[in-house]
Amino acid sequence: IYVPFWLFDADVAADGKYAATMVRTWSDAHYNYTETNHYSLLRSATMTYERVPVDGSSKLDDRLMQSLEPFDFKGAVDFQTAYLAGYLADRYDQSADISLEQANQRIRQSTENRLANTVQGYGNVRKEDGSIRLNNGEPIYVLYPVWLLNTSWQKKKYTFAMNGQTGKFVGDLPLDRTAYWTYFLSIFLVMTLLIYGLVWLFYWMM
């Protein structure tokens, strides 16, 4: 199936203020010492995000579609109906405005994580303040190829998906808990008996 996606660009300016500490301990013949240094750290960065995808179909699980990333935009071509011959194609039912907020949430979270990762080498770090400013470009509407498989097991439905470009396969596999615990307990019992036997063998050899 061809799944509708909105692609978003953004130029980002971000600032962060962090409180950090470093603790040093040492001892002499009489006392134990602890030295705590406190730091106020400022971080600023500009970042550019290109073609952040958000699926435009409310019928599809956003988490599942995000797990299929990345998609390759380099081979994109202008749309022609002939490309859909023999395939299913979904049409977006979530507008670019709605999808924009989802994209910006991902961009903000990624920016915050990347900024925080620049604070290294301290024992404890706490964020005190920060701001993220976004300037979005015009969205692009695309169709990406995705293979979908729906199945059910023990009255529960499962959906699997595969990226039609890269072959990346995602989904939650059903788990037979009875079989799992039977297998686990069997292995545990075998290992227990094996260890017990080795201990007795070692004891009699002594």
Question: Which functions belong to the PLM regions below?
Answer:
Residues I1-K157, T178, Y203-M206:
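Charged, low-complexity helical/coil segments in non-catalytic cytosolic or luminal regions
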Residues D9, L189-V190:
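Short, well-ordered alpha-helical packing segments
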Residues T34, L175, L193-I195:
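Alpha-helix boundary/capping detector
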Residues W153-D176:
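Juxtamembrane amphipathic/hinge helix adjacent to a transmembrane helix
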Residues L173-F188:
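Juxtamembrane/start-of-transmembrane alpha-helix segments at the extracytoplasmic/lumenal side
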Residues L193-M206:
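Juxtamembrane boundary at the C-terminal end of a transmembrane helix
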